[in-house]
Amino acid sequence: KKGLAQRLKAEGENSPADVILTVDIGRLYVYDDLDLLAPIDSKKLQNNIPNYLRSPDNTWFGLSKRARVIVVHKEKILEGDITRIEELADPKWKGKICSRPGSHVYNRGIMASVLAALGEEKAEKWAKDMVANFAKRPQGNDRAQVKAIHEGECEIALINNYYFGKLKFSEDPEQRKWAESVRLVFPNQAEGDRGAHVNISGGGIAKFSKNKE
């Protein structure tokens, strides 16, 4: 939640928090950098969660993974038309892409991934060129992007992969129709390519928890 780290920092030893759970590795780093997490001495966690999904000093652990993938209209976008995240910047997709706001942590994560892969100059150009392809002003959540594709507002978007499952098996028949309109594309899957961007949800024990045991 926005501002939670600052609140915990301000509360200090008086904080009532015991466990901190959050949806992005960037947020976990924020809590760690602010010294808000306590080391966890758990053989069960250490044996079951690999080193790359936890902090070096075991203050936080990844608990689930998700991929940021491309979702396309399954009839208007043919298989193979888009295979890499970089291709979203191609001018041929002008007016075809929908997006939730770039300020959201999910999109900041994918931007960081592209920045790490391409470098600052190329990543900035990619972002600007992709924005130029937007069909409308960024708005809504990931579900809203699938709905927009279903309703013909655009043909391409980025979503977390699990949202497709939520829609496909929704109790709401209208949401199931949205899912039926689209196809997921896991980008950058060719041999030697870096694969889709994967982020984590994770958590740790609050530094001043009274219930660490």
For the regions a language model picked out, list residue spans one by one.
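Flexible hinge/capping segments at coil-to-helix
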Residues: I77-W93
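Ligand-binding pocket segment of bilobal, Venus flytrap-like solute-binding proteins
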Residues: G102, Y106-G109, S113-P187
